[in-house]
From Swiss-Prot:
Organism: Rhodopseudomonas palustris (strain HaA2)
Major location (coarse): membrane
Protein name listed in UniProt: UPF0391 membrane protein RPB_2510
Topology in membrane: Multi-pass membrane protein
Keywords: Cell membrane, Membrane, Transmembrane, Transmembrane helix
NCBIfam families in the cross-refs: PRK13682.2-2, PRK13682.2-5
Membrane-spanning segments: 6-26, 35-55
Similarity comment text for this entry: Belongs to the UPF0391 family.
Record carries keyword Transmembrane helix: yes
UniProt key word Cell membrane: yes
Length: 57
């Protein structure tokens, strides 16, 4: 009985995520993910350059 209960819980969660995903929430989360990607890419490049120059032993 517990497997059926978990299947129904995941069904409800997936339906709710589908409803929210096809509205404006998915666009907002995609914009946020894009901003975070660029921030971490810049941090990675800066640390990579510092690793080859200043922090070289």
């Amino acid at each position: 009985m517990t497997i059926l209960k978990w299947a129904l819980i995941f069904l409800v969660i997936s339906v709710i995520a589908g409803i929210f995903g096809f509205t404006g929430i998915s666009a907002a989360s995609a914009d946020l993910a894009r901003i975070l990607f660029y921030i971490f890419a810049v941090i990675f490049i800066v640390l990579l350059i510092l690793g080859f120059t200043i922090f070289r032993t």
